[in-house]
Amino acid sequence: MHEPVRDARRLPHEQVAPEVLLLRGRAAPTAALVAQIEAVARAAPFRQLRTPGGGTMSVAMTNCGTWGWHSDARGYRYVECDPLSGSAWPAMPAPFRELAAAAAAEAGFPGFEPDACLVNRYEVGAQMGAHRDFDELDMRHPIVSVSIGLPALFLWHGATRGGSPRRVALHDGDVLVWGGAARAGYHAVRRIAPPDLLAGAAPGGTRPLRYNLTFRRAR
C-alpha cells in the first residue's frame, strides 16, 4: 500500500544525514528544465535498461554530457556514445551545469564540474531499489540530484543497505546533494504513487511523471 507523501515544500533546507543536504525548492520553477529534458530525449530517447542479472529497470533513462551511464549484461559503466545510435550523448545544457555547480557549492562542495547527467523518468509505479553510485573514478566529487514533477519518497540508508532508512519526501524543484564520507551511501526511491494518492501533483497539469536529474563527475 502506498504511503502518503506530506507536503514539505515550505520547509527550510534539511540535513538528511552528515554531508547529505536537501535544498528545498532550489530548482523551482522547473518548466524550463522539463523543456530541456524533452530536447535531450529527442536526440537520445528514453529507454529501460537491462541489469547485469537480466532484469529490466522500471525507470526509463537517458543521458546528456560527455559521459552517459549505461547498464547491460556486461555490467554498469559509463560510455561516451549512446549505444542505441552510436552518436555522442547530447551536450549537457548550460542551465543544468550551472544548477548542479551552484547547488553543490551551497551544500558545501564548491568547484563541482559535472561531466555526466543521468536523466531518469519515473512513470507511476516505477521505483529504484537500494543502491549506491559507485561507477565514478574519483569519489571525491559530490552527487547532485534534482527532483521534477510528481512527489517521491526517498530512502537514505547510508553506509549499509539494511536497517531502517531515513525517509525524505521529495517535491518538484527539490535538490539533494551528498558527498564526502556520505558519497557512497545507499539510497532508494519508493514506488511512485498515482497523483490522486499524493499530497502533491504534477506541476502545471503536465503528464503525471517524475523526472530526476543526477549529476556526477564520471571521469
Where do the language-model regions lie?
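Non-heme Fe(II) oxygenase metal-center motifs and adjacent flexible, charged/small-residue loops
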Residues: M1-R219
